[in-house]
Amino acid sequence: MSLIDPRAIIDPTAILADSVEVGPWSIIGPGVEIGEGTVVGPHVVLRGPTKIGKHNRIYQFSSVGEDTPDLKYKGEETRLVIGDHNVIREGVTIHRGTVQDRAETTLGDHNLIMAYAHIGHDSVIGNHVILVNNTALAGHVHVDDWAILSGFTLVHQFCHIGAHSFSGMGTAIGKDVPAFVTVFGNPAEARSMNFEGMRRRGFSEEAIHALRRAYKTVYRQGLTIAQALSDLAEPAAQFPEVAVFLQSIQTSTRGIIR
C-alpha cells in the first residue's frame, strides 16, 4: 500500500503507485499520477494534470504542476510530465504548459533541480540536467541533456540551452547556448567549452580536440556564422560530437551567444 502520512491531503482521483511515500501536510490534487518508488516530502503541493514517473524525490515546500502565470492562460487543460529518477529539492516551482505552445512542460530522467529553482511553462528539460539553486527558466525554454546551469542563472523565454553546456553563477542568458559551450556574465558571453565535463563523461581526447578546434572556428577566427558552419562541415562528418555542436548552431532561432 502507499505510505501516506495521515496528515497529507490526497484527492480521490489522484493515482499513486503502491510504493509511493507522501509526507505530512502535503497536498496532491486531482489529475496527479505518481509512479512507484517516488517520495513526496512534507509541505509539497502537486497539482494536475501532472504525471510523475518512478523513483523521484520531491522535497519540502516545492510547488509542482501549478497553473502558469502567463496572462494568456485562461484555465485550459495543460500538463506537466516528469520522468524517472529526478531529485527536486526544497522550494522548487514547476508550472504546467500553455495551449499557445505544446500545452505541456516536460522534465526527463535523472535530473537534479536544486533549491528554489524555477521551471517555467512549456519548458522542456532533457536528462541528467542540473539546475543549481535559484536558477530560473522563463517559459518555453529547452535545456538539452547534461547541461549544468549554476546558481542564480537566468534564462530568457524561448532560449535553447545545448547539451553538455555550462553557465557560471549569476549568468543572464538571452540567446541560445550552443552545445558544449561555457557561458558567463550578465549579459552572457561565451568563454570556452565545458572540457572538464566532457572528460568526466568519458569523451575521447580526439573528440575533445576536435571540439576545441570547432570552438575556435566559430568564436576566434572572426568568421560569420555562415562561414564558420561551412568550415565545420568536414569535421562534423568525422566526429559526431562536432555534428552536435554544429546542429545546435544551425537550429538556433534566437541567435547564439558569441
From Swiss-Prot:
Its EC number is 2.3.1.129. It is found in: Cytoplasm. GO terms for molecular function: acyl-[acyl-carrier-protein]-UDP-N-acetylglucosamine O-acyltransferase activity. It is an enzyme of class 2 (transferase). Keywords: Acyltransferase, Cytoplasm, Lipid A biosynthesis, Lipid biosynthesis, Lipid metabolism, Repeat, Transferase. Involved in the biosynthesis of lipid A, a phosphorylated glycolipid that anchors the lipopolysaccharide to the outer membrane of the cell. This is Acyl-[acyl-carrier-protein]--UDP-N-acetylglucosamine O-acyltransferase. It comes from Pseudomonas syringae pv. tomato (strain ATCC BAA-871 / DC3000). The lineage of its organism: Bacteria, Pseudomonadati, Pseudomonadota, Gammaproteobacteria, Pseudomonadales. The gene is lpxA.
